[in-house]
Amino acid sequence: MILVSTSTVKITPTGPYLPCFVSGNPLRSEKTNKVHDCFECTVIVFKINNKLMVWGEIDIIEIDFRLADTMRKSVQKMYNVPYENIIIGTIHTHTGPETLEENAFGMDEVKVVPGYREFLVKKFEEAVSECFNKE
C-alpha cells in the first residue's frame, strides 16, 4: 500500500528576519527590507509498504550539511523516519534571504540573520508534522 501526504508552509522572512541580505549576490553589500516573492517549504511524506520517506524542498539558495543534518535528525527523532530516507533540496534562488553561516564567496562577514536558520528548522518540522497529522 502507498500513502502520500503533502504540506507547504511559508518561510518568507518577516518581522525579526528583516532586514536581511539577499543570497548569492556577493557584490550587494546592503540589506533589504523588501520582499518581492513569497518563499515556501514543501514536504511530501511517503509510506510505501510501511517504509517511511520524507522529501523536502525549500525556497532558498542552498542548504549546508549542518542545517540539513539538524532537520533530518529532528524528523528522525519525531517520527522514526530513517535518516537516509529524508531528502532535502533547494530551488537555488538568488532572490531569497541568506541562509549560510559560512560565506560562499570567502568574505569574512556572516550574513545570515540571527535566528533565521532555527526558524527554517521549525518550519520544516511544522510541514512534516502537518503531513503526519493529516487523515
Where are the model-predicted features located?
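Conserved beta-alpha junction segments in alpha/beta enzyme cores
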Residues: M1-G89, T93-E135
